Amino acid sequence: MKILAILFLSLSFVISYAQAPEFNGRTWEAPYHLSSPANWGVERFPIPIDFAPQIPYKGVEDIRFTPGWAKAASDEFWSYAFLWYLEGDVKTDAKIIENNLQQYYHGLITANGIDTSNAVITTFKEIAKDTHDVKTFNGTIQMFDYMAKQTIVINCKVHVKICKNKTKTFIFYELSPKPLSHIIWQSLDALWTEFKCKK
């Protein structure tokens, strides 16, 4: 009887897993508002992330690419932002951010067919929190740029927010190799300023 019960539970798991709908980033309806400026690219995929499965979260990554993010001659090169919409109350600090982004960009470089013998170096610190943030961080990511085939240092701002129901955590990353005084940061900042927990 015990064996039969185990077989039944196993079969139920297999059936429910097989019936789980595959995530479709193009049709997925976000329950929050994150602006999509004209001519900016949008991409969404599930977390855990295929190329960085070591990052221990469950949710969705929602990306906004500037029009020139993949053009080496553009002031917008490597300038983009992404939101992690995560299950639960996720704890984070500067060290966790460093580790997560190190795994993330190591995996991204590998996924683009580049040898990752050159380490990804991430350095972050907590700073005075922005309005409505639970925590705010800034730092840098030094890595091999798989598009330009050379080392690049990307500046990064990180915002953490937990909305009223406290069942989701939002971690928003703004990224650009341009200094924080450059005008591109106004566009990236605006994405977070205009963010709303609900549509």
What are these regions (language model features)?
Residues 4, 94, 181:
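Flexible, glycine- and charge-enriched loops at secondary-structure boundaries
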Residues 27-28, 32-33, 40, 94-103, ...:
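Hydrophobic transmembrane alpha-helix bundles
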Residues 134-199:
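Short, well-structured beta-strand
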Residues 3-14:
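Sec-dependent N-terminal signal peptides
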Residues 41-69, 125-159:
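Generic detector of solvent-exposed, compositionally biased contiguous segments
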